[in-house]
């Protein structure tokens, strides 16, 4: 049977990575119409199908070669990889790129009233988690015996409901822990979204499309962390002013009409400019300072 030449990309249907995944694809020029209840969306300008599934299903779809690409949190990817390995399987995939969203951490937490001295305080405790494999690996590496309490949601209420003594759950800001009278003790895994590809080689048409998408993803991410700077600067202060601006490439220096002492400086800065930097530029004699966002960028 001839392989379908349309590229299949799996993303989270709903949840913390869903909107950012769709935004990334859109910024990469993938046009599509999404219906809320639909599990699949077809790109209208590229041979791409978007599968909207549960995040826990994405690693398996990649491991089994059902889809070509997937956007998934590293925590879910690693948990599923460890689970497959525990069953004697050897899951394979290609990590194409770590993305700039979905940042979180998997942490051990205890009730606020519990005194904590070191990790051995978790010895023999019952720990509620949705990530048993990551927890098991960490505890084994640290020589700690514990009892596992597998839950799929509302992990933070487990101690209060007397289901567990402690929890191991995802933390972003820590507000949920605080609201449930818990304190974060130890980060056991740091995670972000990533773009992965199935291990088996793609046909020529699909690989060419993946290469195009990867170029665009890199451009989008670089644009997000860069700013276009325009300012007027005294000629004698150019070196000091340029030193304050970490640029992707050398700046463009342009003469100003009827002004022999100053020039216009245009450049792409690889870092976000804070007020302190702009104030430092001002102190060095820069004026008319403009900091503009960059929508797309290719080096």
Curated annotation (Swiss-Prot):
Its cofactor is Mg(2+). Pathway: Amino-acid biosynthesis; L-histidine biosynthesis; L-histidine from 5-phospho-alpha-D-ribose 1-diphosphate: step 1/9. PROSITE patterns: ATP_P_PHORIBOSYLTR (PS01316). Its EC number is 2.4.2.17. Belongs to the ATP phosphoribosyltransferase family. Long subfamily. This is ATP phosphoribosyltransferase. GO terms for molecular function: ATP binding; ATP phosphoribosyltransferase activity; magnesium ion binding. GO terms for cellular component: cytoplasm. It is found in: Cytoplasm. Feedback inhibited by histidine. InterPro entries: ATP-PRT_HisG_long, ATP_PRibTrfase_cat, ATP_PRibTrfase_CS, ATP_PRibTrfase_HisG, HisG_C, N-reg_PII-like_a/b, N-reg_PII/ATP_PRibTrfase_C. GO terms for biological process: L-histidine biosynthetic process. SUPFAM superfamilies: GlnB-like, Periplasmic binding protein-like II. It catalyses: 1-(5-phospho-beta-D-ribosyl)-ATP + diphosphate = 5-phospho-alpha-D-ribose 1-diphosphate + ATP.
